[in-house]
C-alpha cells in the first residue's frame, strides 16, 4: 500500500493526521487469494481507507465489480454478464465481463455432456468446469453458480455444496444462484424431466410454502454469509417480493414472458 495514490482532496484531509499506514487483514487475504503482482490491486475491488483515532490509516479492499484493477472504475456504468459454462466460449469475452451466471442445465447439458462443446471430453465434473472458469475470468468477475437441487430437504447438504463452490471460487467471487420455485416442489419436480415435461400444477395454484421456498432458501443462505443471485422469475411484479429475500442480484426473464404473450 505504500505506493497507493491518494486523491488531492483526500490527501488534504489526511495531511498531518496520519502517523502509521497498514493494510487490513482482508486486504492481505485478497492479495494472497488471487496472487496479485506486486504494486497492484486486483480488479473487482475498490480501495477504501479508514483513519483510526491513533493516527493509523487502514487500507482495505472491498468487493465491487464496477472497479477494474488498481482502484480504477470500469469505463461505463453498464456491467456486462454472460450466461455460459463453456470455458472456450467465455475466454474471448472474459476481459469485458463483470459477472458470469450458470445453472445445472448449462453446465451439464450444454457443456459437459455435449461432445461438440466439451472438446476431447476434457472436462468431467462441474468442479473442473468452475475451476477453469475462475482461472479464465480472474478476480474481477463474480460467478453465479446455481444449486444442483434447490429442493434438497437437508439444508446442511446445501451448505456443503456452497462450501465447495467457495473453496473453488473464493468468497469474494461466489454468488449462489437460487431459483424462484413457484408451484414446483420436491414431489412434482420430476414432471419437468419426464414425458411431455409439463407441470401438472398451474403457476397460480402453488401452496404458500412452495411459492416461497426459493425466497426462504435465499434468506437462509444469506444468513450464512452467501451473496445470492435470485433467478427464474417471469413477471416484473415478482421482483418486489424477491427483494424481500435480500439478494445481491435478481434475474427476471421478462423477455421470455413477453415472447410467450405475443406468440
Question: For each of these PLM feature ranges, what is it?
Answer:
Residues 1-77:
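Long, compositionally biased, glycine/small-hydrophobic-enriched stretches that function as flexible linkers
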Residues 2, 17-19, 28, 69, ...:
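Context-gated lysine
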Residues 45-61, 76, 81-212:
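Active-site beta->alpha loop and helix N-cap motifs at the rims of alpha/beta catalytic domains
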Residues 62-74, 134-135, 163-166, 213-225, ...:
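Surface-exposed amphipathic alpha-helices with a cationic face
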Residues 69-71, 89, 95-96, 239:
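Generic structural signal for short, flexible, solvent-exposed coil/loop and linker residues
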Residues 81, 153-156, 225-234:
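Active-site glycine- and acidic-residue-rich loops that bind
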Residues 196-219, 226-263:
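Catalytic alpha/beta core domains of metabolic enzymes, predominantly
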Amino acid at each position: 500500500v505504500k505506493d497507493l495514490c491518494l486523491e488531492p482532496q483526500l490527501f488534504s484531509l489526511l495531511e498531518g493526521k496520519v502517523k502509521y499506514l497498514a493494510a487490513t487483514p482482508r486486504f492481505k487475504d485478497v492479495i494472497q487469494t488471487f496472487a496479485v503482482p506486486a504494486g497492484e490491486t486486483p480488479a473487482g475491488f475498490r480501495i477504501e481507507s479508514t483513519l483510526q483515532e491513533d493516527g493509523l490509516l487502514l487500507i482495505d479492499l472491498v468487493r465491487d465489480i464496477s472497479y477494474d484493477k488498481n482502484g480504477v472504475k470500469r469505463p461505463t456504468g453498464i456491467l456486462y454478464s454472460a450466461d455460459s459454462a463453456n470455458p472456450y466460449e467465455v475466454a474471448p469475452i472474459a476481459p469485458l465481463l463483470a459477472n458470469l451466471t450458470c445453472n445445472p442445465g448449462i453446465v451439464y447439458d450444454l457443456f459437459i455432456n455435449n461432445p461438440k462443446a466439451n472438446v476431447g471430453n476434457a472436462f468431467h465434473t462441474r468442479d473442473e468446469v468452475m475451476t477453469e472458469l475462475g482461472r479464465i475470468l480472474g478476480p474481477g468477475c463474480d460467478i453465479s453458480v446455481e444449486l444442483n437441487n434447490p429442493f434438497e430437504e437437508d439444508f446442511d447438504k446445501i451448505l456443503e455444496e456452497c462450501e465447495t463452490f467457495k473453496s473453488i471460487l473464493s468468497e469474494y467471487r461466489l454468488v449462489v444462484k437460487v431459483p424462484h420455485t413457484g408451484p414446483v416442489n420436491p414431489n412434482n419436480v420430476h414432471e419437468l424431466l419426464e414425458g411431455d415435461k409439463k407441470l401438472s400444477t398451474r403457476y397460480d395454484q402453488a401452496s404458500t410454502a412452495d411459492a416461497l421456498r426459493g425466497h426462504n432458501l435465499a434468506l437462509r443462505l444469506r444468513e450464512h454469509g452467501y451473496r445470492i443471485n435470485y433467478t427464474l422469475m417471469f413477471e416484473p411484479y415478482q421482483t418486489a417480493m424477491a427483494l424481500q429475500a435480500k439478494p445481491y442480484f435478481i434475474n427476471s426473464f421478462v423477455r421470455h414472458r413477453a415472447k410467450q404473450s405475443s406468440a
